[in-house]
């Protein structure tokens, strides 16, 4: 395994002001002061220069998922393995690498059409989080093992078998567990990077119009989750799922729809795993309790 963490997301928004207000006032992220020649805006949650790059466009979709490698050697090996397997790997320019605050990156698409940006050498500026909503800390680090990434993302993977092989044999992730939820023909494969977070990426075996099923950010306690839930209600935003706790990663969370419809899970108490002692599991139930799902326009 060579992927260290899921480092950032590039999100296209039809209303960047609304997305930035959601990110800061509701989620409690901090807007970066960075200026971007392409007009992108940035949300940060820790000492990284950004975790979410918000770019203007007609549709609300995930543009790319940034996966970090621990060294140039690991990154080069992954790129070489992908090319040898017949995947088109596109190195990014130095200018584009600087926009992402990385030493180097390359783009590749998985067999289900999701765009990845593989990179190494993230450039930190160590500006501390100053959350406009008063969030004290987002869980992005483990004191013993270092960076765990911003949280996790669940990507659509209708070409499920080939996409699993792509991530496990070429990209450098490993399967944490497998879920067959009580929904016809549904499956979710959870994958971890080389850090203790129970999953950094997951694959859902159906297509999704926004290019991402949901993204997750984690805070340090239940009170932070409760205060965020209050902010969601005050903002009049639709809940996708009520408060609940998952079976696999133990996350106590709720789900909210961001402006434009991308789902965000907001939780705490996520499981951290010693992978040398872990055996992947198969489940048929996703929640210990709660998480009553409501899909706007469907459950109305």
Which residues are covered by each model-predicted region?
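Core segments of cupin and vicinal oxygen chelate
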Residues: 1-4, 8-50, 155-198
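N-terminal beta-strand motif that seeds the catalytic metal site of vicinal oxygen chelate
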Residues: 1-17, 62-67, 130-161, 174, ...
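Vicinal oxygen chelate
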Residues: 5-14, 57-146, 187-192, 236-300, ...
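Catalytic cores of nucleotide-enabled group-transfer and carboxylate-activating enzymes in metabolic
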Residues: 6-32, 45-60, 69, 90, ...
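Conserved active-site tyrosine of GNAT-family acetyltransferases
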Residues: 19-24, 82, 113, 163, ...
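A short beta-turn/loop motif at secondary-structure boundaries
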Residues: 35, 57, 96-100, 181-183, ...
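Flexible internal linker/loop segments at domain or repeat junctions
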Residues: 189, 197-210
